[in-house]
């Protein structure tokens, strides 16, 4: 009998953990770059979608060629729009910020800017330098825009070795990271029709 009770408790616990990890109330945002082909008519018909983050820049010189067009289309269907910068470990923070600002100043947006921190294309072998540059970039964003930027990340490497962003709002890629950080503000929870789908509990938390 005791064995049966233990088994039942374990089963109930497993089910509870599964649903607590997998359930996301509402996917209400997308993030895109020049890699995405967006069907804006479908997005407009989806009344749950409230916001769209769009890639603006990367490193010291790359500027997404579709940024302005994506912003225009997103705003035309009434979405809140934000811009993000892809962080590069091999580029000084000042040069990265100058690149982002050059696009941000010319494109209308109303969401807190985002710094995208990922392993792809980066070398984290010099952890001290990566942290130093990211910390400085966060400071430059905060000085310019009056609030800490949201930091997107989703790899175990970034979460383990990069500490500079721990006091920033976090945008967590749940497809790769199964736990939630205390300051998680946005959750990237699914890919539908080649679009990253996200959940933000309160849109006011990310409005600039």
Predicted feature residues:
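N-terminal Sec-pathway targeting helices
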Residues: 1-11
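Bacterial Sec-dependent signal peptides at the C-terminal "C-region" and cleavage site
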Residues: 15-25
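Functionally critical loop-and-helix segments that line ligand-binding/catalytic clefts
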Residues: 24-33, 38-42, 48, 163-208
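Substrate-binding cleft of extracellular glycoside hydrolase catalytic domains
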Residues: 24-38, 42-44, 53-138, 142-145
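Hydrophobic anchor at the start of a short beta-strand
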Residues: 81, 147-149, 170
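Short beta-strand/turn micro-motifs composed of small residues
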Residues: 85, 153, 174
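Glycine-rich, charge-decorated loop segments at or immediately adjacent to ligand/cofactor-binding or catalytic sites
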Residues: 95, 157-165
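Aromatic-lined carbohydrate-recognition surfaces of secreted/lumenal glycan-active proteins
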Residues: 146-159
